[in-house]
């Protein structure tokens, strides 16, 4: 059970003054060259990402966020970025998550859509982001709801909430019932069911 009073106390104690001076634009080649063989991405995201040449880097405590953009107008308002970081820090502090996170936020404008009749469910229908529990990198693939997706991906790193020990029978049942293309989409299904 979540203690909302404790959550509010943590939230109110977090100061964002240190973040204000840690916004800087850098060259993309310094950060990451490309999304190679990404099974969670789709063609349009890769095209958008490859056309991004600049990155807005924002740092605080144990979080670095890189916003990949084509035009400065694509960058979310500073107030929204600060609020998102405060919310993420609240979750990290509340659940005592010890990870140093590196976010790659690709500001692709495509929206989620449901598959057409007889179309197989795929990442472009579900994914807003992804992470690996064994790494500290989190990828956010859509401008749409980026802040909610960032928080959602951090929650995957909370051992009290996330369990990746699906049995083979559970995975096969989910794949059959939801017409999933392959087993890599089990995390996508988790996203679909939890949002």
Region locations from a protein language model:
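Intrinsically disordered, low-structural-confidence terminal and linker regions
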Residues: 1-24
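Acidic, Ser/Thr-rich intrinsically disordered and amphipathic helical segments
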Residues: 83, 87, 149-153, 193
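Short catalytic/ligand-binding loop motif for oxyanion handling, primarily in non-cytosolic enzymes
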Residues: 113-115, 158-159, 166-168
